[in-house]
């Protein structure tokens, strides 16, 4: 692959904010803006997943240099659905909103709406063109993905001593004034990853433990004072090839009809290849199996094969197609949708 094409692709797939537009940089103060417009259509026999799914995502990242050792920073990101009526108040949501301080070689500490520690691992397989990353990660589900009330400490290269060894410590305050499946009590999480000093291979692991709320324990399914999860992952990223796998287990955490699963076992895998003319095919698999569910026993909660591809016109424009081949039984006890979905679209990002 030629170097210019590789640089474009890496910048796109790593993070939307990597190629943010710098709007201000003066006297130690810096402000970047980033965003994307995703024009997307779903095709499915499942009515709620059929039709226009377009949205706009926009955010900013700011920094201020306090002294040669200390930096303040903040980030905000929101999403606006374009398939809703203008009068629909649900068309906008805040994805991220946090502020913090970073001390050189010691690490960073921030508070707000952020990514949970468990997602540090699952992010490695959340790489499909549209779907993926949904075996155990769910928004506002303890510390599995984006969540509120997170105090997060992050340290890279382990205080400057071990290259490639990154550590996260996280605390989540209780959130009770919301839908019961989005609630959480006080909790703690941690994650660690190591790339063996900059090699093409990396491993990671995470653990979270949280109190559950009284209302959660009143549900028909899933009881227990604590919600617990652990995860591990590996990835290889070199020679135009990306391969990653993920495994996790949760206890009294994953929402199901009528409450929560007492236990889940989750697996994800993805393999992608980057052609030098811009095409990136993708093949993946996602499975979440619920265990010991009251009145059910064991049941697949998520089970699908994913086949997709992205074509990068340049660093700002891409087209994609993603086929979610659902493997759930049509007569599953929990009434989970078993229809396939095809997503097709164009993405402009900056």
Curated annotation (Swiss-Prot):
Induction notes from the record: By phosphate starvation.
Localization in the cell: Cell outer membrane
GO (cellular component) term, any one: pore complex
Family the UniProt entry places it in: Belongs to the Gram-negative porin family.
Record carries keyword Ribosomal protein: no
Keyword Ubl conjugation among UniProt keywords: no
Signal sequence residues: 1-20
Residues forming coiled coils: none
InterPro entries assigned: Gram-neg_bact_OMP, Gram_neg_porin_domain, Porin_dom_sf, Porin_gammaproteobac, Porin_Gram-ve, Porin_Gram-ve_CS
Gene that encodes it: phoE
Entry-linked PROSITE patterns: GRAM_NEG_PORIN
Pfam family for this entry, one: Porin_1
Stored SUPFAM superfamilies: Porins
GO BP: monoatomic ion transmembrane transport
Topology in membrane: Multi-pass membrane protein
Described purpose of this protein according to its UniProt entry: Uptake of inorganic phosphate, phosphorylated compounds, and some other negatively charged solutes.
Name the record gives this protein: Outer membrane porin PhoE
Organism listed in the record: Salmonella typhimurium (strain LT2 / SGSC1412 / ATCC 700720)
Subunit description: Homotrimer.
